[in-house]
Design a protein with these regions (language model features):
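Mid-chain, well-packed structural core segment of small domains
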Residues: 51-80
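N-terminal positively charged helical leader segments and presequences
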Residues: 30-53, 61
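Structural signal for conserved beta-strand scaffold positions within catalytic alpha/beta enzyme cores
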Residues: 20, 64, 82-84
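N-terminal first-folded block
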Residues: 4-39
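Glycine-rich nucleotide phosphate-binding loop and flanking beta-alpha elements
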Residues: 26, 44-45, 91
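Short, ordered loop/turn segments at secondary-structure junctions
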Residues: 23, 42, 67-70, 88
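Contiguous effector/interaction surfaces
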Residues: 2-16, 88-100
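C-terminal structural segments of small proteins and small subunits
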Residues: 72-106
Length: 106
């Protein structure tokens, strides 16, 4: 994962503007709380489908990105299959960096 993106994600963590795993699914239906979701490339197909379907339904941007271990390392956890950013500005920056290809991911 590229350093700029890691720093932006860490900023979201410090600002407590994030959600993990199943919390993402329940938070989606509560208005505009989630702005961007990073789904691990090595998450199970069933998990990817569940997240993608729900996020598409609620028109929330998502990206298949990184691995479960890399996402988990940012939070000092083992593995995380999905990481959501709640802050619009941070989400916009992360999405822009990923779409520009400014990373060494998958």
């Amino acid at each position: 994962m590229q350093e700029k993106i890691k720093n932006m994600i860490r900023f979201a963590i410090r600002a407590r503007q994030y959600a993990l795993g199943e919390t993402i699914i329940s938070t989606c239906s509560k208005g505009n709380a989630i702005k961007l979701v990073l789904i691990a490339s090595d998450a199970s197909e069933a998990s990817k489908k569940k997240y993608c379907d729900k996020l598409t339904y609620y028109k929330i941007n998502y990206v298949i990105y990184s691995t479960k271990n890399e996402l988990g390392d940012l939070l000092n956890k083992n593995e995380i299959s999905a990481f959501a950013i709640k802050d619009a500005n941070i989400a916009k920056q992360v999405y822009k960096l990923i779409k520009e290809g400014d990373w060494y991911g998958i």
